[in-house]
C-alpha cells in the first residue's frame, strides 16, 4: 500500500512540473489578475512575514517553485522542497515583483524529507523568516496556517488553510487550503510568524481512469528535530 501511495505522488509531482513548463501556464506574455504587491493591506503579522520572505526558485533550464528567505548563523539561505531543486545545484532566486535576482547554490538535500536548503547572498528587498522546529504531532487539528508562493504564471499569492489531518506518506500534515503547480516549496507559517513546514504536494485522485488534482488538499512537511539539527549544522 505504501509503495502504491509513493508511486501515486511521484506521478503527481511529475505532473506538477509538466504543468509548470506548459506554455499555457508559464507564457511570459500571459496576463495575471491584479495582485496585491505590498503588505500595507495585510492585517495579520504572520501573513506579512510570509509575503516579505517569499522567493521564487527558478531552474536554469526552466520550471520554478517557491521558497522562503531565512537567516541562520549570520548567513542567508533559501529553504524549499527537495523536488523543486531535483539534482541541480544552481538556481535563480527572485524576490517579489522581480525587484532582485541572485544565484542560489544547493547545500543540503534531506535524505528522508522533501526539504532542501540553498545558500544565497543577502537580499535587500526580502526579510528573513525564522525556522521553528516542529513535529507532525505538534500541528493541531484546526490550527490556522499561512503560506505565500508563486503558483503557475502568477506573481506572489498568499493562501491560508487549516490543519485537517495527517498522512504517513512523508510524515505529512494535510491542510485544507489551496495550492497549484509552482506552490511547491512555499514556507508554511504558524500564527506566531515562524516557518514550521513546506508545501510539497497537492492531492491526487483517480476518477474514471484518469488522475485529477485536488488543489484544496495541500500536503505539508514539517521541519522536525532531525531536520533542524542537520540544517543548523550545514549552515555553519
Show which residues each predicted segment covers.
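Flexible, gly/ser-rich surface segments that form the specificity/activation loops bordering the active-site cleft
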Residues: 127-173, 179-183, 199-211
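Bacterial N-terminal signal peptides that target proteins for export
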Residues: 1-12
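C-terminal cap/linker of serine protease catalytic domains
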Residues: 26-47, 125-127, 195-236
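Short, solvent-exposed secondary-structure boundary/capping segments
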Residues: 114-119, 171-177
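A conserved glycine-rich beta-strand in the N-terminal activation segment of trypsin-fold
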Residues: 41-43, 52-78, 101-103, 185
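Bacterial N-terminal signal peptides
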Residues: 11-20
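Catalytic-histidine neighborhood of serine endopeptidases
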Residues: 23-30, 72-125, 141, 201-203
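Catalytic nucleophile loop of clan PA
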Residues: 68, 178-199
Amino acid at each position: 500500500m505504501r509503495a502504491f501511495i509513493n508511486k501515486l505522488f511521484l506521478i503527481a509531482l511529475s505532473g506538477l512540473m509538466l504543468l509548470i513548463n506548459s506554455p499555457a501556464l508559464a507564457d511570459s506574455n500571459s496576463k495575471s489578475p491584479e495582485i496585491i504587491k505590498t503588505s500595507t493591506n495585510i492585517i495579520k503579522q504572520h501573513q506579512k512575514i510570509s509575503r516579505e520572505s517569499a522567493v521564487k526558485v527558478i531552474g536554469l533550464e526552466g520550471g520554478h517553485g517557491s521558497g522562503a528567505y531565512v537567516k541562520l548563523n549570520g548567513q542567508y539561505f533559501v529553504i524549499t522542497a527537495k523536488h523543486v531543486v531535483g539534482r541541480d545545484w544552481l538556481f535563480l532566486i527572485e524576490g517579489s515583483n522581480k525587484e532582485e535576482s541572485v544565484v542560489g547554490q544547493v547545500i543540503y538535500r534531506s535524505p528522508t524529507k522533501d526539504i532542501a536548503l540553498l545558500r544565497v547572498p543577502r537580499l535587500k528587498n526580502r526579510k528573513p523568516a525564522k525556522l521553528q522546529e516542529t513535529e507532525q504531532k505538534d500541528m493541531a487539528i484546526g490550527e490556522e496556517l499561512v503560506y505565500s508562493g508563486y503558483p503557475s504564471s502568477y506573481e506572489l499569492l498568499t493562501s491560508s488553510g487549516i490543519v485537517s489531518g495527517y498522512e504517513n506518506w512523508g510524515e505529512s500534515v494535510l491542510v485544507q487550503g489551496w495550492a497549484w503547480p509552482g506552490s511547491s516549496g512555499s514556507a508554511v507559517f504558524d500564527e506566531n510568524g515562524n516557518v514550521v513546514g513546506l508545501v510539497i504536494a497537492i492531492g491526487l485522485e483517480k476518477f474514471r481512469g484518469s488522475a485529477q488534482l485536488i488543489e484544496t488538499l495541500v500536503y505539508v512537511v514539517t521541519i522536525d528535530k532531525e531536520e533542524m539539527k542537520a540544517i543548523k549544522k550545514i549552515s555553519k
